Regions:
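Cleavable N-terminal signal peptides
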Residues: 10-11, 21
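Active-site-proximal cofactor/substrate-binding loop regions of enzyme domains
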Residues: 22-92, 96
Length: 235
């Protein structure tokens, strides 16, 4: 794991440890772009596993497909992962996609991260949109409260698999068994939100069969800084 990624994770941990007293603080969203074919990714995956145990973090691992040429096809790869990463690369003024890339709250990534400056900025910007998730009679209920003067946002539903192990047969990780956490299985846009009270209903049966949990992200259109996030176990 690179020094910049270590600094980024240290800043996240420090911020989470100091944010607990704020009852209205929403969870911090930590997104990892990763691949089973990348030998630098397992330590970052382990960090996602640690973060996923925290109630004050929404940790998601997006598996990309551009490592396939090295001989191993990631069974969890999604075209949407690459699309999402490319938007962040543009927004964060990076030259190209890479793994492992850690994006924090849609605002920072690990490249050149200044840990103390990042933690301070994140703490100052963590607005909280009223967001409640529940499951009732095989339906996922998403209820968003009012938040005046909010930017136009997308409401994203992200089903994920909490934990998996994969035996890798080829590529950079050949011969290893990898532990993977909070693996994104799909992303769909439920609708838009502009600060008004809003509700969505989703049939649990319509979600990927291997999804164990869902995250809902409220994010300005174009993948701007997060304004809301919550998770809900499906079983």
């Amino acid at each position: 794991m690179t020094n910049s990624l270590r600094r980024c994770l240290a800043a996240v941990m420090a911020l989470c440890c100091t944010a607990g007293a704020g009852a209205q603080q929403r969870p911090l969203v930590v997104e990892l772009f990763t691949s089973e074919g990348c030998s630098s990714c397992p330590p970052a995956e382990a960090a996602i596993g640690q973060l996923s145990a925290r109630a004050d973090v929404v940790a998601l691992a997006w598996h990309v497909d551009y490592w396939d040429d090295l001989g191993w096809r990631d069974r969890f790869e999604l075209p949407q992962s690459v699309k999402r990463q490319n938007i962040y690369v543009r927004n964060l003024h990076r030259a190209s996609v890479y793994t492992p890339q850690l994006v924090i709250d849609g605002r920072f990534d690990a490249v050149g991260a200044d840990g103390s400056a990042m933690a301070k900025a994140l703490a100052a910007q963590r607005t909280s949109v009223p967001l409640r998730l529940s499951v009732h009679e095989a339906e996922l209920l998403v209820d968003i409260g009012a938040q005046p003067q909010s930017p136009g946002c997308d409401v994203l539903l992200v089903p994920y698999l909490r934990h998996a192990t994969s035996a890798i047969g080829r590529g950079e990780n050949a011969g290893r068994t990898l532990e993977e956490f909070n693996i994104v299985r799909e992303v769909r846009t439920l609708g838009s939100w502009k600060g008004e009270p809003k509700a969505f209903r989703v049939s649990v049966a319509s979600l990927p069969r291997d999804a164990t949990d869902v995250a809902v992200l409220i994010q300005p259109s174009g993948q701007g800084p997060m304004v809301g996030a919550a998770i809900q176990p499906l079983r």
